[in-house]
Amino acid sequence: AFPTWPLMGEGFFPADAFYVPDGGATWRAFFENPGLVQFLHRMLGYLVFAFGLVVWLKGRKSAHPRTKLAFDWLAAGLFVQVVLGIVTVLQSAPLHLGLAHQFGAILLFTLIVRARHRALYPISTSLRDQKA
């Protein structure tokens, strides 16, 4: 719908966001209007990115190195997914980039589950196991 970033065409919000072609109910625009759907997808992406950064900063405070590493991987996956989403938009969503973006979402979900598991069930470490 809008192969531009960060703006959507000329503005932040698409001008015809609530237009439904057959004059149907306005609520259908949330599912049928490509501009509004893309806007909502972008806003969800920004929200996930901001929340992910907060979670990463909190996860970095763990005393367990493997938990920290899991949150680092989460932040890296989040960054790659955002960049991939922006590139997909700028290239007008070719199939290979769209599929890569969807695969990135699955990978990001997996990294979230892994980081959460590491935070809830950290691998205990001992000073005796450390090599000098």
Report residues per predicted region.
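Polytopic transmembrane helical bundles with strong interfacial aromatic enrichment
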Residues: 1-132
